Amino acid sequence: MTLYRTRTYIAADFDHDKDAVDQLHKWNDSKHWSLSFTDAHDLQTSSDDSLPCSIKSSLKYRMDGSKTFVLIVGDHSNSLTKGGCQLCGSYNSHILSCARGRYVDYRSYIKYECDKAVEAGSDIKIIVLYNDIAIDKSKCPLAVRDKGIHAPMVFYKDGIYYWDYQSVKEAFDS
């Protein structure tokens, strides 16, 4: 079955940056904003208690159906380990292999997703949004650090932080 690249894939540290993901969905779902995308995560679901290799297989399927990859970068994005086989109960650290006979991949989910986006090459647009008022590439995974469009999601005015719709919209439109 051929999967057409029509969706937007959103990658983030859902433990720390879910607020930014939720804000993207609010703008997308609102009739008052012109941000519009179809979330690739609607293609296939996987549960949090699945094996990392099963989840990565599902992530790859979603990525293969995406024309845009959006990474939300926060304070922990570049140091995450969740998704690495070394954290799976099926991983045997003595012989460095999977007890289920699956491939061993030490990358976190975010690093895996970034690598897959880069591997897609010109088939996918890469947008890196920072859950902050500034772009800090040291927080960004190496694979996409110098790829695509980078933009802040937040601005600061009169002592208050606000979501920066205009910055995000310009990143999507460029």
Stretches with model-predicted labels:
Residues 70-80, 168-172:
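Hydrophobic transmembrane alpha-helix bundles
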Residues 1-69, 172-174:
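Conserved N-terminal substructure of TIR/SEFIR domains
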